[in-house]
């Protein structure tokens, strides 16, 4: 642990639609703290509704940082988020206040507490080579290449995960070492693991499924169609992360009149439930035993479980 790691931070993890944002606001009010986005999709602009970013009313209740600050035309990495958090925590006006990290991206939480892996720079020539092959051959073909050259990391990646497959191949060619080996070398942590309050929400699965369905119907009614229309007007590369946000493909199909409203909503709800299941599985298997598990945000405040770090 780095000596200058922030002490007494609050970390709130959990699947989408589990009530994390409401809990974070309640904690910010109780502690005078500020909220930091810890979700890789909520960093992108334009998609306020589809990425379930805090509403204007939410933003008025507590200070929020690192939401919607990245243009959807960009690719935003864990490393860039780490740099942005480091700069944020160094701001004078935030010193002495409790940072409340809330979101559903496990790798962000891992970086906060354990530091970032010291992966090497890759030459433009190598990068262009593999990205060109990805564009020409597709993710499945390059995943097959990775299975031969680096089977250990290939087994850990989905065959459709084009960004991470290319990164693994780039690093292997540039250094002769697997990305897994580089990932073992950690940098400094930003948050002190020992003093942090680490909370993970694990709601009832049936309850979460109903909540997801209701939330997406509300998104549709509140303007998700207009969001996707605005995104499509930017004429972006379909491979960009923002273009892969749940709901974008379905609403796009509705706008193209190749899918009905009902089917677009149903498919988006199914995709969101599947995503929530993957998130829950990751948190269950990857977070340490010192993370306290709650069924809801309300439960955190019951029985004196929550302690004000101030």
Swiss-Prot record:
Coiled coil regions, renumbered to chain: none
Binding of substrate, residues: 16-21
Residues binding ATP, per UniProt: 14-21
Positions of disulphide bridges: none
Reaction(s) the record says it catalyses: adenosine(37) in tRNA + dimethylallyl diphosphate = N(6)-dimethylallyladenosine(37) in tRNA + diphosphate
One Gene Ontology molecular-function label: tRNA dimethylallyltransferase activity
Annotated site residues (Interaction with substrate tRNA) in this chain: 105, 127
Cofactor(s) of this protein: Mg(2+)
Pfam family, one: IPPT
Record has Cytoplasm as a keyword: no
Residue ranges, annotated region (Interaction with substrate tRNA): 39-42, 163-167
Enzymatic class: transferase
Record keywords: ATP-binding, Magnesium, Nucleotide-binding, Transferase, tRNA processing
EC number(s) on file: 2.5.1.75
GO biological process terms on file: tRNA modification
Alphabetized InterPro entries for the sequence: Dimethylallyltransferase (IPR039657), IPT (IPR018022), P-loop_NTPase (IPR027417)
Family: Belongs to the IPP transferase family.
Reported function: Catalyzes the transfer of a dimethylallyl group onto the adenine at position 37 in tRNAs that read codons beginning with uridine, leading to the formation of N6-(dimethylallyl)adenosine (i(6)A).
Subunit architecture: Monomer.
Protein name stated in the entry: tRNA dimethylallyltransferase
Natural source organism: Brucella melitensis biotype 1 (strain ATCC 23456 / CCUG 17765 / NCTC 10094 / 16M)
């Amino acid at each position: 642990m780095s000596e200058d790691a922030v002490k007494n931070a609050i970390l709130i993890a959990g699947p989408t639609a589990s009530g994390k944002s409401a809990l974070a606001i309640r904690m910010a009010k109780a502690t005078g703290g500020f909220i930091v986005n810890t979700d890789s999709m909520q960093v992108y602009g334009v998609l306020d509704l589809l990425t379930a970013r805090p509403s204007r009313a939410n933003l008025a209740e507590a200070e929020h940082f690192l939401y919607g600050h990245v243009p959807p035309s960009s690719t935003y990495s864990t490393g860039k988020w780490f740099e942005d958090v480091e700069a944020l925590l160094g701001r004078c006006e935030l010193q002495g206040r409790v940072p409340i990290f809330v979101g559903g991206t496990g790798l962000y939480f891992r970086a906060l507490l354990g530091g970032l892996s010291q992966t090497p720079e890759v030459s433009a020539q190598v990068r262009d080579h593999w990205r060109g092959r990805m564009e020409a051959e597709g993710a499945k073909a390059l995943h097959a290449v990775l299975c031969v050259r680096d089977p250990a990391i290939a087994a850990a990646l989905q065959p459709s995960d084009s960004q991470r497959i290319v990164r693994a191949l780039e690093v292997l060619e540039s250094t002769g070492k697997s990305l897994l080996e580089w990932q073992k070398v950690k940098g400094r942590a930003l948050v002190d693991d020992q003093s942090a309050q680490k909370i993970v929400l694990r709601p009832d699965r049936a309850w979460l499924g109903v909540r997801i369905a209701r939330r997406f119907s509300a998104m549709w009614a509140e303007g998700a169609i207009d969001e996707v229309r605005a995104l499509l007007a930017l004429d972006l590369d379909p491979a960009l992360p923002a273009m892969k946000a749940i709901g974008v493909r379905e609403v796009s199909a509705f706008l193209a009149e190749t899918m009905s409203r009902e089917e677009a909503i149903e498919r988006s709800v199914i995709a969101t439930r599947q995503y929530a299941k993957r998130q829950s599985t990751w948190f269950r298997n990857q977070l340490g035993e010192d993370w306290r598990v709650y069924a809801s945000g309300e439960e955190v405040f019951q029985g004196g479980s929550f302690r004000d770090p101030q």
